[in-house]
Amino acid sequence: MLEKIKENLFLLLIALFMVGSIGIYIFSANQYKVNSLTSGDKDVIASIDKLKIYADNLYKDKLDSDTLYWQYRTAVINESQETTKEIKSSAKKMTNNIDSYYRQQNPNDENYVALRKQLSTFGFTGENAINDYAITVKKETELNKKYITKHYDKLVKNVEKKSPKSIYLIFLQQEETPAKENTKAYVNKLIKKNGFKDTAEKYASVTANLGLTNNKGLYGYTDKDEESNDFTQKSSTIPGEIVKQVMEMKKGESFDEWTSVTDSSGNTYFVKAYVDETNIKKMLNSDDETVVDKTISSFVNNNNTLSSDILDHYASKLEITYKDKKAKKEITKYLKEMRKNAKEMEEQSNEQGNEQATEQAN
């Protein structure tokens, strides 16, 4: 779990690093139009949720297309989705996980200090800095889900090809003299008596410590793309050999026998998996955030233009006024280039799929 947090933080810093100064107003079309804003004695050239960009900072840094794009994207997200109680709650959990990780290490950890400093640079200050960004992340998830749901039949085809499943895991660490309750025979009896899911929850501490599951033993979404996973203590990803077996299973099925896997540090585990769900629509609407998030990611990853389509869709519903002509030009150019690249990737993917189908037919 901690490694997942570290990876997310790395992405968080990358994204935040690209959020810079830009002269742009974005607000809902049905709201009043704002011509100018001030905060104290400074002119505000952008007001996006709680983030304010001041005019005297506008030209401190070189106008960069990546910077402009991420500012544009952040603005569209924040103005397109209201901050619901559910989003606040989910963002708070994300914030607490990040804070907990660093405070377990060192409250003065240089990475944590760097994160707070970077957040401050972009206007996210005080105790709520990380939470404000987390809210933006959760808003984007909600917008993606709405769009995918509306266009589900068209988008699901590429996801179906990956045979997605939601699974539970039980890991037993190999020991010379394991306690009775940690033996394969004992756990087999529990599975037969109480069912796989209840037993997985009882032994979830092992998989949770490996960063693989929640405290109920739920790993969540997996598909063919994870068949090549390496198993390391730092990867927080299910071993590829387990995924390969899961891909051959149906809903309600579990491993008949225990599978032995060894991580990169030489630790060996006995593993069993259970397929809880194969219905993609149900996974998209799961009560578990991890299942939903990974399902959404699969839709985005397997439909190359989807990210651009979603952004364009919500941006079209907003009133966008650029105070800086160069900014408008750079953003427009960036968006066109991004869509062009996405279409090229989609064409290449389709060609590869056709070639594979031809090979299999022959």
Q: Positions of the model-derived regions?
A:
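Soluble non-cytosolic domains of exported or imported proteins
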Residues: 60-75, 85-93, 109, 128-138, ...
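Peptidyl-prolyl cis-trans isomerase
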Residues: 186-244
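Acidic/polar surface patches and capping/hinge elements
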Residues: 39, 138-170, 178-185
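C-terminal soluble interaction/assembly domains
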Residues: 259-262, 269-293
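N-terminal targeting/tethering segments
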Residues: 31-132
